[in-house]
Regions:
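Glycine-rich FAD pyrophosphate-binding loop
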Residues: 30-50
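Active-site substrate-recognition segment that forms the wall
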Residues: 198-232
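Conserved N-terminal helical subregion
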Residues: 3-13, 30, 55-167, 171-188, ...
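Conserved Rossmann-like nucleotide-cofactor binding loop
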Residues: 21, 44, 160
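Flavin-binding catalytic cores
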Residues: 232-263, 326
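C-terminal helical "tail/cap" subdomain of flavin- and related membrane-associated enzymes
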Residues: 2-11, 73, 80, 99, ...
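Histidine-centered metal-chelating micro-motifs
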Residues: 161, 180-182, 208-211, 286-287
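Conserved mid-domain beta->alpha element of the FAD-binding
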Residues: 15-31, 39, 154-155, 260-341, ...
Length: 381
């Protein structure tokens, strides 16, 4: 519990959002001696989505936060990514550099690990607590009318951030042509016997994709990706018959799909600035991107950790926030560009898309661009 005495003797942060960005910022600031209170509007910490890839860059952040061991416990060490067409022919194979770690994990496990470490460092996590706006002088305005004063307000409240919008920070917000339904299913004994869980398979058929990713010894993460205009494809509960028509060789897998998925359309967001006065914006609220290289959470955690690092080195808030954005934003925007670019084939004719995917898997330049973020050493690690 953060006491009034703590707030008076330490620099104090009010953080909005209990996802990757908010929890990473909370843990990192607490490690630097801040008093921290985190607000999550939901009654529990439950992330959107089901599974997630965490690459070397994100794993370094988790290590720094003390959450690494618990976050990746039981998760497969990912080593191979295949792309296949509607006839199950392999279009490309990418084998990750074994010296750079990649884990496919259950999102909830990572969130729980980060929250546990944040609490150990003194962070107060308040559930069912909704913030609706902030002021540049560091005041957080709550849905119940309270106004909470802080040295720093951090907005990690997602793509529809009320804090960001209250400060008029959006430069560009663009819905993308595709989206995804994400679910978790049980991993069968046959699947467990046939594979170590380290191979991810992305199956393409027209503009539809089925991503198959083991995330534990007993669970598989499935992402169904389709054009937003594909009303049948994005329907929840999932229209199994329609997906079987697209992927007949995956009929047995599709029969195992559960009905509790959620559809989300991908978006791109770019801000005028990552901060306004004493308010910093993190995660999807600042730089939403499609998941085509699996770095949404990675960028969020890197930027959260580096925010605490710059604030610790430079006591002047304005200078610290300006330096943070100047140094960290280029890598994030590279990640956004390459993620959007790799989503373009979704709208292309099948022959053109097949040729691109085959070429992209062989191009050293393309591989270097898509792995640049994963190979980046996060500031503060």
């Amino acid at each position: 519990m953060t006491t009034r005495k703590d707030m008076q003797s330490k620099r104090h942060a009010e953080i909005v959002g209990g996802g990757f960005a908010g929890l990473a910022a909370a843990g990192a600031l607490a490690q630097k001696g801040w008093s921290v209170r985190l607000h999550e509007r939901s009654p529990e910490l439950r992330p959107t989505g089901a599974g997630i890839y965490i690459y070397e860059n994100g794993l370094r952040v988790l290590e720094k936060l003390g959450a690494y061991d618990e976050a990746v416990k039981g998760a497969p060490f990912a080593h191979t990514r295949e792309m296949r067409d509607e006839q199950n022919r392999v279009l490309s194979v990418h084998r990750w550099d074994p010296s750079k770690r990649v884990f496919s994990v259950v999102r909830q496990r990572v969130i729980n690990a980060m929250a546990d470490e944040a609490r150990k460092n003194g962070v107060e996590i308040v559930l069912g607590s909704e913030a609706v706006a902030a002021t540049p002088d560091g005041e957080l305005i709550m849905a119940d009318g309270r106004r909470l004063k802080a040295d720093l307000v951090v907005a990690g409240d997602g793509i529809n951030s009320k804090i960001r919008d209250s400060l008029n920070l959006i430069a560009k917000r663009r819905p993308l042509p595709d989206g995804a339904v994400r679910i978790m299913i049980d991993r069968t004994p046959q699947e467990r016997a046939a594979s170590d869980g380290g191979t991810t398979i992305e199956n393409w058929s027209g503009s539809r994709r089925i991503l198959y990713t083991p995330v534990s010894d007993t669970e598989v993460y499935i992402a169904l990706t389709m054009l937003h205009s594909d009303e049948v494809g994005r329907r929840v509960p999932i229209e199994r018959a329609s997906w079987k028509q697209s992927f007949p060789h995956l009929s047995d897998l599709i029969d195992r799909f559960v009905d509790n998925g959620q559809y989300g359309r991908f978006e791109y967001i770019r801000l005028k600035s990552w901060s306004a006065g004493r308010v910093a914006i993190l995660g999807d609220a600042a730089h939403a991107l499609p998941p085509n290289i699996g770095q949404g959470a990675g960028c969020s955690m890197m930027n959260a950790l580096s925010l605490a690092w710059y604030l610790d080195r430079e006591k002047d808030m304005a200078t610290a926030l300006r330096t943070w954005e100047t140094n960290e934003r280029p890598m994030t925007e590279h990640t956004q560009r390459i993620s959007v670019f790799l989503g373009l084939p979704t709208t292309w004719p099948t022959p053109m898309r097949r040729a691109f995917l085959t070429l992209a898997g062989k191009s050293k330049w393309m591989v270097a661009q898509r792995t640049k973020t994963a190979r980046h050493i996060p500031t503060g690690t």
